[in-house]
C-alpha cells in the first residue's frame, strides 16, 4: 500500500498462496457471470473471502489516513477481478471507496481537468451481418449526446444529454472515426458495439465497426491524443481483458496511445444492463468531482435499485426513457446484481 507522503506499507499474507488467490479470483469471476445464479447471492462468500485477503490487511490504515480513492496495480491472473464487488460482510468495496485499475504507477496522468466542459463523440452499431443485434445501442447513444446542445453542461441544461456528435451504424466507420478525431476536439469518446478478445491472437481480437473490424494491433494507430482524449468509454464486451503480451487489452493499448483514462468491461456484458449503466454514468458525470467517483456513484445507484426497468421504460437519475418493443419486459427488474455493474472498471487516471 502506497499512500501520499508515506513509506510503502507491505503486508505478507503467508496463509494465502498466489495460486490459491488466482483460483479464487477465477471462481469469483465465474460465479458473478453465471446466468444460472443471476438472481442469487451465491457470489457473496467468495466476495467476502477476497475482501479479507486483499483489503482487510490494510483496512485500519485506509481508515486512519481517510483514504477515499484506491488505485489497484494488479498482477497477472488478477486483472479480471471485479474489485468493486469485494464485500466486507456489510457492503461492497465500491460503497466505501472510489476505485480504479492502473497499469503502472509511473504511467498515471495526474493532471486534473473538470470533465463538465467536455464534448462527446458517441459512435456505435446496433445492426450486424454476422453477429447478434444490439437494439439498446441507439437509445444509449441518444441518451448520452444531445446534438442540439451547443454549450457546456450547467445547471440550466443538466436534464439534457451532453454536447457533441452521434454516429450510428453506416456512419460508424473507421474513416469517419479518424476524420472526427482529426478535425475536431472531443474530450470523451464513446464506442458502443461488439468486441472480442482472444489471448495471444491480436489479429483476431477486435472492436466491430460498421464496415470493418478494428483489430487489437491497430488501436495504437488511431490518433486518440491529438488533442488528448480525457476519457475513452468502450461500451462493449471484454475490452479491459488482456494477456501477458497486452495488459488490459483494448483499454490498455488506448492508454498507451495517449488516452488519459478508459472505462472498459471485464466480461460479456448485457445489452440492457449496459444501457442502464451508461445512462446513469453520464448523468453522474455532470456533477461528480472525478471519473472514479462517477463510476462509484453509478454503481451505488444500481446496487440500491435506483436504476431499473419497468415494462416499457428505463428509470434512472435523470428520469425515464421509453423503450422500443424489442427491449420491453414483463414486470419490473433492477440491476443490483454485480453482474450488471461490477464488470465495468475505470483504468488509469481516476481524475
Q: What role is predicted for each listed range?
A:
Residues 1, 10-12, 71, 122, ...:
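Structured core elements
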Residues 1-69, 89-171, 273-277, 282:
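Peri-functional-center coupling elements
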Residues 133-224, 270:
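Functional beta-strand-loop-alpha-helix junction segments that form "active/interaction loops"
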Residues 78-88:
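A short acidic (Asp/Glu
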Residues 103-106, 110-111, 187-280:
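Catalytic cores of nucleophile-dependent amide-cleaving enzymes
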Residues 70-72, 123, 144, 189, ...:
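Residue-level detector of buried hydrophobic side-chain packing
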Residues 67, 275-351:
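An often Trp-containing, charged/polar helix-loop segment at the C-terminal end
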Amino acid at each position: 500500500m502506497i499512500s501520499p507522503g508515506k513509506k510503502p506499507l507491505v503486508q505478507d499474507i503467508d496463509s494465502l498462496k498466489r495460486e490459491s488467490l488466482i483460483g479464487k479470483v477465477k471462481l469469483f469471476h465465474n460465479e458473478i457471470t453465471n446466468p444460472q445464479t443471476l438472481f442469487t447471492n451465491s457470489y457473496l462468500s467468495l466476495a467476502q473471502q477476497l475482501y479479507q485477503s486483499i483489503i482487510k490487511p490494510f483496512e485500519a490504515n485506509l481508515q486512519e489516513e481517510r483514504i477515499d480513492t484506491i488505485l489497484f496495480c494488479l498482477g497477472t491472473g488478477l486483472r479480471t477481478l471485479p474489485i468493486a464487488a469485494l464485500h466486507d460482510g456489510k457492503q461492497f468495496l465500491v460503497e466505501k471507496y472510489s476505485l480504479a485499475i492502473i497499469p503502472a504507477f509511473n504511467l498515471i496522468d495526474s493532471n486534473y481537468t473538470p470533465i463538465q466542459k467536455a464534448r462527446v463523440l458517441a459512435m456505435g452499431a446496433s445492426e450486424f451481418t454476422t453477429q447478434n443485434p444490439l437494439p439498446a445501442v441507439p437509445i444509449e447513444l441518444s441518451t448520452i449526446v444531445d446534438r442540439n446542445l451547443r454549450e457546456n453542461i450547467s445547471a440550466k441544461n443538466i436534464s439534457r444529454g451532453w454536447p457533441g456528435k452521434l454516429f450510428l451504424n453506416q456512419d460508424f466507420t473507421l474513416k469517419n472515426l479518424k476524420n472526427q478525431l482529426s478535425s475536431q476536439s472531443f474530450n470523451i469518446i464513446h464506442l458502443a458495439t461488439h468486441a472480442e478478445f482472444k489471448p495471444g491472437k491480436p489479429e483476431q481480437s477486435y472492436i466491430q465497426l460498421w464496415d470493418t473490424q478494428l483489430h487489437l494491433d491497430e488501436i495504437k494507430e488511431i490518433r486518440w491524443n491529438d488533442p488528448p482524449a480525457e476519457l475513452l468509454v468502450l461500451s462493449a464486451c471484454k475490452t479491459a481483458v488482456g494477456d501477458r503480451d497486452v495488459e488490459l487489452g483494448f483499454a490498455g493499448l488506448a492508454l498507451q496511445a495517449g488516452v488519459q483514462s478508459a472505462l472498459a468491461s471485464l466480461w460479456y456484458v448485457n445489452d440492457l444492463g449496459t444501457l442502464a449503466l451508461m445512462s446513469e454514468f453520464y448523468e453522474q458525470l455532470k456533477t461528480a468531482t472525478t471519473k472514479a467517483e462517477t463510476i462509484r456513484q453509478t454503481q451505488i445507484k444500481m446496487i440500491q435499485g435506483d436504476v431499473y426497468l419497468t415494462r416499457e421504460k428505463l428509470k434512472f437519475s435523470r428520469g425515464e426513457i421509453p423503450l422500443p418493443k424489442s427491449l420491453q419486459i414483463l414486470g419490473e427488474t433492477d440491476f443490483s446484481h454485480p453482474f450488471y455493474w461490477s464488470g465495468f472498471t475505470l483504468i488509469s487516471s481516476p481524475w
